Amino acid sequence: MRRTYIAIDLKSYYASVECMERGLDPMTTNLVVADLSRTEKTICLAVSPSLKAYGIPGRARLFEVVERVKEVNAERRRKAGGNLFEKSCDAHELATDPSRAVGYLVAPPQMAKYIQISTQIYNVYLKYIAPEDIHVYSIDEVMMDVTNYLQTYHMTARELAKVMIS
């Protein structure tokens, strides 16, 4: 029998949690999760998608973020005729106003919170799928065998995934 699976990998999970906690859009807010009490050699636990768009890897060291943002701002300054004004952490603002400097937030890691929210998300999955059909790979990644649920819910796998994540 052919099986149908849904794979869910939450995008930049730690950074997304930090953005949501602040009422910010995780897809457009420049944010890294890192412990500033350590040196700039500390590894960022997460980098938001909008910062990754500047070529910053997901597990960068903090000094790499600092250097890359300096490079980006030097280029923005050159294009803006030598002047950059206020920093912005919002990708939309930066896209529409070339006179703004790229800024970013640094959020300290909150592992207990990430585990708590991951549990809440897992409980949403349990409303639709039995635990024996959910295979947890990490705090933000699951694979679900939904073969036996599609007929029950009269949905495709894509439709079921959309219901679970909405």
PLM feature spans:
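Gly/Gly-Pro- and Ser/Thr-rich, intrinsically disordered tail segments characteristic of DNA damage-repair
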Residues: 1-166
